[in-house]
Amino acid sequence: DKLAKEMDDLNMGYLINLSGSGFGPQSAKDLYFNQSMKNIKENQPERFGLFVNVDFESIDDVNYGETQANIIKDAVAKGAIGLKIYKSLGLRNKDSSGNRIAVDDPRLDPIWDICGKLGVPVLIHSADPFQFWLKKDNKNERWFELKEKPNRYYAESSFIPPFQEIIQEQHNIFKKHPKTTFINAHLGWMANDLE
């Protein structure tokens, strides 16, 4: 009730929890999601929505795509209204061989397909601001952030590919899955370049 009152004070009608599954092993994600959904349904379901999240750590499992699609199906049946993909996909997530999992990795296709079939959107956050790949100097508008958080500087990374490669991987899934609604978080990091 306190949160709903604060929302009223802000003239906010609806709030979506994008991290509806939380983090950790799948059993913990399932528990967190179920508790969150129960809380919403028992309180103010007309004011709150929940997105589900998927696991990339098990991508090498034989039935990975089917398993994740079933998790999404189950979550939507329970009331999830979308899928949130964190920026770690394409940046930091690795398969069991230590290889970067690309945003357009075909093992992920069942995830995008089921969201299209179920009619739920995929809010996908790919890469980071492109300035994190530029030279750290007075012409980089994020120089201070990079000074304060040097782990965000990717230009010299041997693991993280160039910004444009990650964004292209994202655009590849948009093209490959036309029946799926994708929401490109942060305008694909190009809000200041709308050409």
Features from the language model and the residues they span:
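Mid-domain alpha/beta scaffold segments of enzyme catalytic cores
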Residues: D1-L118
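Catalytic pocket-lining loop regions of alpha/beta-barrel enzymes
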Residues: I101-E195
